[in-house]
Regions:
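Acidic Gly/Asp/Thr-rich repetitive segments characteristic of extracellular carbohydrate-active
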Residues: 20-52
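Extracellular beta-strand solenoid repeats
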Residues: 45, 56, 64, 85, ...
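Right-handed parallel beta-helix
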Residues: 103-215, 220-223
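Right-handed parallel beta-helix/beta-spiral solenoid domain characteristic of secreted/periplasmic
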Residues: 20, 26, 61-138, 521-522
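All-beta strand scaffolds that present successive hydrophobic residues in beta-strands
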Residues: 63-64, 103-106, 126-131, 154-157, ...
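Short glycine/acidic-rich loop motifs that flank beta-strands on beta-rich extracellular proteins
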Residues: 51-57, 87-95, 113-120, 143-145, ...
Length: 522
């Protein structure tokens, strides 16, 4: 008997207390009162109503709205009917302060701080041009988030966070430990800061959130390494997703559209995100923009119908691979400000200006891209303002005054240029003071394959078809022009391979092959 009693005592001591459910307002008048009474593992279940309080969670507890998975107008219906009202004053406390291992599930959090519609509209109208660099940013002086995660691992899910005076959901990391909270399935809009803000070495998983009409980015990260997956960010005053100050996020599978600036914006030295498989469209600036010495990897994204470039780089060092840029109102891919880029295996189709523009002293290695535009005056590829480009093994279809314009230095080799229509201009137009080596390309359907004046030129080993009159035209070269080993194929018996005015270098082994009516060479 004594042994049996001893066993029962041992079981009682070793078995943890069963988790309890504390109900608000049935058992506790306020959410905070229920939280204070809860133990790790307990759930605070909150019924529909408006609760005018700001709360601080305890480790290991779940605070959840009562209800099921029924969807309402903005999010879950239960989140729409259980409202945490911060009182509309600035104060010193966030709307919700998360704790280690805690969960916040299914609330509307609003009125934390002072939301000013006039301030929001002013910055929306100016595209955030007058917005201070830290205004509304996580960890800026005086930041009071609606939901604050201070160097703890926790879960924030199914919430609606809106009309707050600062950032919606803020995550701050620590140099002493990994901070990897889960931020999922939330709706964050009309906050006077970012929708979700991440700073100071935090590494959260941010997925399946909808962030719109926030004063800064829908999702912003600085000096952090979050995983930003499958979110929808639209109509934000700045970028849909923004990263800066050495951030190294993975940004994957997001939709960013109709933002007042870029769909995804990357800036500052040391900032090196992987930006992949996103869809960025109808943004007021670039689909994906990067600048100021940032070093992003930009791959397999779709960028279309943006008001500036599909992908725009200003003074940065991107790797741009496998993207599709369509119908943007400026360039498909644009470089300026001494940018240095590798541009490989992209598809740029029907962009209003150039498919690829390399300007303002930039440098680019451009390989294995498909570049298409029907109609329009601008060239498909422009190397301008003393820029440098290596252009190899690309497929180019169409063009305006030229398929490719060179006002700088370019090596053009192994490409396939195909004109579209009888009024097609030159394939490669080399401007005064430029330097070009044009080798082993296939040109079909342009007025001339090469038209160069007052430049330094080497043209060799090219095949030229369906040109008009003169295949290669060189005028007044700054140094002797070398043109050799080129083959022109034409039905015109008067066709000429090379026409040079001015100083000649090596001009040899250029051949015209006359084409019969049946298309065969004679």
């Amino acid at each position: 008997m004594l042994r049996f009693i001893a066993v029962l005592i041992l079981i009682a001591v070793s078995t943890p207390a069963l988790a309890e459910t504390l109900r608000v307002p049935q058992g506790h008048r306020t959410i905070q009162a229920a939280v204070d009474a809860a133990q790790p593992g307990d759930t605070v279940l909150v019924s529909a109503g408006t609760y005018k309080e700001r709360i601080q969670l305890k480790p290991g507890i779940v605070v959840r709205s009562a209800g099921d998975k029924t969807v309402g107008k903005k999010g879950l219906k239960r989140a729409e009917t259980v409202i945490l009202d911060g009182g509309g004053k600035n104060g010193k406390k966030p709307g919700v302060l998360m704790a280690k291992g805690s969960t916040l599930d299914g609330f509307t959090i609003t009125n934390v701080g002072v939301y000013d519609e006039a301030i929001w509209k002013k910055h929306f109208d100016s595209q955030g041009e007058e917005l201070g660099d830290d205004e509304g940013s996580v960890q800026a002086e005086g930041t009071i988030p609606a939901v604050s995660i201070q160097a703890v691992n926790c879960t924030v899910t199914n919430n609606i966070v809106h009309h707050n005076g600062d950032v919606g959901i803020a995550i701050v990391g620590s140099k002493d430990q990994r901070v990897t909270p889960l931020i999922a399935n939330n709706v964050s809009f009309r906050n006077l800061g970012g929708g979700v803000g991440i700073a100071d070495l935090a590494e959260p998983i941010v997925r399946d959130n909808a962030c719109s009409e926030n004063l800064r980015a829908g999702i912003g990260c600085r000096n952090s390494s979050p995983f930003i997956f499958d979110n929808t960010c639209f109509n934000n005053v700045r970028a849909g997703i923004g990263c800066r100050e050495g951030a190294r996020p993975i940004i994957r599978g997001n939709k960013c559209y109709q933002n007042r600036r870029a769909g995804i914006g990357v800036r500052m030295k040391g900032t090196a995100p992987v930006v992949e498989n996103n869809e960025c469209y109808e943004n007021d600036m670039a689909g994906i923009g990067n600048r100021d010495d940032a070093e992003p990897i930009i791959r397999n994204n779709k960028c279309y119908k943006n008001k500036m470039a599909g992908i725009g780089s200003d003074g940065s060092k991107p790797l741009i691979v496998g993207n599709e840029c369509r119908e943007n109102l400026m360039a498909g891919i644009g470089l300026r400000g001494k940018a240095e880029a590798t541009i490989q295996k992209n598809k740029c189709v029907e962009n209003k200006l150039v498919a690829i523009g390399v300007t303002q002293g930039s440098t680019a290695t451009i390989t294995e891209n498909e570049l298409v535009r029907t109609g329009g005056v601008p060239p498909i590829i422009a190397v301008k303002d003393g820029s440098t480009a290596s252009f190899d093994n690309n497929d180019v279809k169409g063009g305006g005054v030229a398929a490719m314009l060179v006002q700088g230095t370019a090596t053009i080799s192994g490409n396939r240029f195909t004109g579209m229509g009888e009024k097609q201009g030159n394939a490669v137009w080399v401007w005064k003071g430029s330097k070009a080596t044009i080798a082993n390309n296939d040109f079909v359907g342009y007025r001339a394959a090469v038209n160069a004046s007052e430049s330094e030129l080497v043209v060799m080993g090219n095949t030229i078809r369906e040109f008009r009159g003169q295949a290669i035209v060189v005028k007044d070269s700054s140094k002797p022009a070398h043109v050799f080993g080129n083959t022109a194929i034409s039905k015109d018996e008067k066709a000429v391979v090379v026409a040079i005015q001015g100083t000649k270098g090596v001009v040899a082994d250029n051949v015209v092959k006359h084409q019969g009516e049946d298309g065969g060479e004679e």
